[in-house]
């Protein structure tokens, strides 16, 4: 889970810092303190938000991955989580439980949100980094009354292939190795697995990141359109205009998406974004071809300084 910073305000392979065991026990302190631990994919750190009681930021090798508020799981800090939250809100009447598969766990921000806003939802989380998942469960536990959330360690695509057909209302792909989406989660073949897992009218959603000239985002939009008849792309206007690197949300379904409601929610958010669908999306995609496994590549790396924590 990676969020590109707004102008208004499974992770890296480089050498990880040394483990700091002295920070690896919150319960030893009256006040929350940072927790650091080496994981399979990098050095993970949980840092308390000094400005918000209960708020925690998860980083991996310095790249922001997730933000959770233990006191209020409905608080979504990052713009991409807010957009995914709006999408989930609009897919069904308020409070109706959903069956959701989360590919990519991070600190389980969205599973916590859906457990709070749609009690009774059955949610499965798949995270490739086992030590990271253990760190989050140890210090930011997500289990509680009404929270039917199971988390397992594994590869997102392999887990998706094992999901019973027609069993999910929503499949969310939010997988980053460092700051890049792995190639095997960007192809038509992968999208077909997601489509198979969904119930009729179910929705697939992916959090991605791209920058000028948006070649990756266009190719991913073409790929989703090759599998789903109804597709929308959501991003900040400056990202769509090719002015900067940022997060891109893609959603696809076999049923019409609530585009008008979604457009209103995205435009009115504290991080305003534009929804592109229909002919506008076709124009954006142009002649870009869908991506197959044979030519799939990781998403482009962010520019220097795009993801950083001081």
Residues of each region from the PLM?
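Alpha-helical subdomain
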Residues: 185, 210-217, 223, 238, ...
